[in-house]
């Protein structure tokens, strides 16, 4: 916001609403672990990538021996956050699975803890935060081929000037180590805040 010379206004919304708000002109920049897919590039522009992350599956610890490879999830019930790369990945790679798509990751975590889904497909960084304060859950050994995805900031289509400024800020903060520092710091804060609930 400082580099653009504008006042920062943060709006918290679910992922699907965020993308709709961006394409509808209600927000100028969306930063929420957004993967710049070819489909999304049709309706919005993206900055340079700033955060690579692997896609993982969270399961209940008691099921640790049941879900070791992707095929073990075929035909099972799998939870995802709605309108995400993880939703598309689960639909594409987990054959005959019943996909449960919910607006927020905590809702899917609750479904998993209650036994309503067998696994949760999530970004590794996000999933790691939930594992810290849910000691009954774990990452499975399931691996998705070519599952490392990168996040980028999304802007309204045709806003090349904003993309250029965002790219400058990304480069500066990658080069000086801030992204790594921020990821560590805010992951820790997320865990601390969750522990208070």
Positions of PLM-derived features:
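Extended ligand-binding regions for polar small-molecule ligands
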Residues: 1-4, 61-62, 77, 82-84, ...
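Bilobed "Venus flytrap"/periplasmic-binding protein-like clamshell domains
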Residues: 2, 35, 56-107, 124-126, ...
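Acidic, polar ligand-binding/catalytic clefts
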Residues: 7-72, 135-139, 143-146
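Hydrophobic residues within well-ordered alpha-helices
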Residues: 22-23, 73, 112-113, 153, ...
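Short, Asp-centered acidic motifs that coordinate Mg2+ and/or phosphate
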Residues: 28-29, 118-119, 152
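A ligand-binding cleft/hinge motif common to bilobed small-molecule-binding domains
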Residues: 34-43, 89-92, 113-114, 118-147
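Periplasmic-binding protein-like
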Residues: 52-59, 128-171, 189-197
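Ligand-binding clefts/hinges and TM-proximal coupling segments of bilobed small-molecule sensing domains
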Residues: 85-100, 139-143, 170-197
């Amino acid at each position: 916001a400082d580099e653009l010379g504008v006042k920062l206004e943060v709006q918290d919304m679910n992922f699907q609403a965020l993308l709709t708000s961006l394409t509808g002109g209600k927000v100028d920049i969306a930063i929420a672990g957004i993967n710049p897919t070819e489909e999304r590039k049709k309706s919005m522009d993206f900055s340079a990538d700033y955060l690579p992350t692997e896609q993982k599956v969270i399961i209940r610890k008691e099921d640790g021996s049941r879900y070791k490879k992707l095929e073990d999830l075929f035909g099972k019930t799998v939870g995802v956050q709605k309108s995400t790369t993880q939703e598309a990945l689960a639909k594409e790679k987990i054959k005959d699975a019943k996909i449960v798509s919910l607006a927020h990751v905590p809702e899917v975590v609750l479904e998993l803890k209650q036994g309503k889904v067998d696994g949760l497909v999530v970004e590794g960084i996000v999933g790691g935060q939930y594992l810290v304060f849910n000691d009954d859950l774990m990452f499975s050994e399931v691996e998705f081929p070519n599952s490392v995805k990168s996040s980028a900031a999304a802007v309204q289509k045709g806003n090349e000037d904003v993309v250029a400024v965002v790219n400058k800020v990304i480069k500066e903060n990658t080069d000086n180590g801030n992204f790594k520092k921020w990821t560590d710091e805010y992951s820790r804060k997320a865990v601390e805040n969750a522990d208070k609930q």
